[in-house]
A protein has these predicted regions:
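Accessory alpha/beta interaction modules
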Residues: 1-159, 281-285, 293
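Hydrophobic/aromatic-lined pockets within catalytic cores
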Residues: 29, 90, 94, 165-170, ...
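Short, charged alpha-helical interaction segments and adjacent helix-coil junctions
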Residues: 60-72, 172-293
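Coupling/switch segment of ABC-type P-loop NTPase heads
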Residues: 153-181
Length: 293
């Protein structure tokens, strides 16, 4: 199974909606950052002699670095990989004080989209230093399976919503034959849509609602690639409002564009063309091109 879609969706949220990571950081590391805290995105590519290491996210809040990896499977080598990633991040951001360096490791965690009873709550490795001292390197493991939709909304963990569909992944074959199971899924996603709409559109975040809903549908389409009825059902439940919001956005952009054109015509004393610009689409497009609008 090609798992790059999960990385793509996760990185899209980190890069374009980094503030969604703040509640997750608060949840995992018991911090209390406000939603509008300043976030600096650090480099995800870390050059080493034997090749390049690419991490999913590295964020700076205040003076603290946070590293979150999104993992679609329960990889038993993840603890070693995290040490490697974190060491690369720490070295790249090392501070030099005279001839002495200060290397601070990031606060890290792994988001497991799929997990099992064997997936630990912490990924751990014993690191033995040359002086014989042992330090336990411990990374919190976040498991999607532990979060219901109610928990997600209560804790504002909206970043987890695109991956919520993973809990239904093993039931998809049963849903082909059992319409009741399918209806349970669709009802749950209708609740998600309503809660998300209330959470975001009423607070002036319609664009975030649209973008997040698109990512929810994108993951669902991938998980249910061969189940057309399920794909269509989720698309109908989640996608309808997105199209409506997109329509409203385009309408607003169109009105703003026309208003700009009319102002330009007034400035140029081309009064006779204002009516034509408002009623004749071809003339309007011609004037848009003329003014470069």
């Amino acid at each position: 199974m090609n798992n790059t879609i999960f990385d793509d969706v996760f990185r899209t949220m980190i890069e374009k909606m980094p503030y969604l990571a703040v509640p997750l950081i608060n949840e995992v590391f018991h911090t209390s950052y406000p939603e509008d805290v300043k976030i600096t995105q650090l480099r995800n590519e870390h050059q080493q002699k034997d090749g390049e290491i690419i991490t999913d996210s590295c964020l700076l809040i205040g003076k603290k670095m946070y590293h979150i990896e999104c993992q679609s499977t329960d990889d038993t080598t993840m603890a070693i990989r995290m040490i490697e990633y974190d060491f690369a991040i720490a070295v790249e951001n090392a501070e030099k004080q005279g001839r002495r360096y200060r290397i601070e490791f990031p606060r890290s965690c792994v988001l497991f989209l799929r997990s099992s009873g064997n997936t630990p709550d912490y990924l751990e490795a014993d690191v033995i230093f040359p002086d014989g001292k042992t330090h336990v390197y411990s990374i919190p493991a976040i498991k999607m399976a532990d979060y219901t939709k109610d928990h997600i909304f209560e804790k504002n963990l909206l970043m987890l919503l695109p991956f919520y569909i993973m809990r239904y992944e093993k039931k998809k074959h049963d849903m082909r034959k059992n319409l009741e199971l399918l209806q349970i899924l669709l009802d749950e996603y209708d609740e998600i849509r309503i809660n998300l709409e209330k959470e975001l559109t009423e607070t002036g975040k319609a664009e975030l609602y649209t973008n997040l809903t698109k990512l929810i549908v994108k993951i669902a389409d991938y998980i249910f690639e061969k189940e057309e009825d399920i794909r269509k059902g989720i698309g109908d439940v989640m996608g309808g409002k997105v199209l409506e919001l997109e329509s409203e956005r385009l309408k607003a952009e169109g009105e703003a564009r026309l208003g700009d054109l009319i102002n330009r015509l007034i400035q140029d004393q081309r009064m006779e063309e204002i009516q034509m610009a408002s009623t004749d689409p071809e003339k309007r497009e011609q004037l848009y091109k003329e003014y470069g609008i």
